[in-house]
């Protein structure tokens, strides 16, 4: 039996001080989350992630943003304190993708 996940407003989970929003100009109050996808292989993410999900990954290169935009993911969270290049942040800003780092 498959359980349906309830949607929450993204800003409700952002009050945790372990996370830092890096992208600018995105209205976090309007972002709705439908689930999570955890993985690091871009081809797997493209095949299995669903629109509205948050993607948890250690990948931090600009192609991550391209994949997130293609699938219409709610956000990308780069975990484990991995450094995110400025180029990736710039691409996230250009494409309107919510990019978050764990601290």
Feature-to-residue mapping (PLM):
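Conserved catalytic and cofactor-binding micro-motifs
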Residues: 1-48
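Feature captures the catalytic cores and cofactor-binding loops of soluble hydro-lyases/lyases
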Residues: 30-33, 39-54, 58-103
């Amino acid at each position: 039996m498959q359980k349906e996940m309830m949607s929450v407003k993204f800003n409700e989970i952002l009050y945790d001080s372990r996370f830092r929003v890096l992208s600018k100009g995105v209205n976090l109050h309007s972002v709705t989350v439908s689930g999570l996808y955890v993985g690091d292989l871009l081809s797997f993410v493209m095949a299995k992630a669903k629109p509205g999900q948050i993607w948890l990954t250690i990948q931090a290169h600009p192609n991550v943003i391209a994949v997130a935009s293609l699938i219409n993911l709610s956000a990308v969270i780069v975990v484990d304190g991995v450094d995110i290049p400025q180029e990736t942040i710039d691409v996230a800003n250009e494409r309107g993708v919510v990019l978050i780092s764990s601290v």
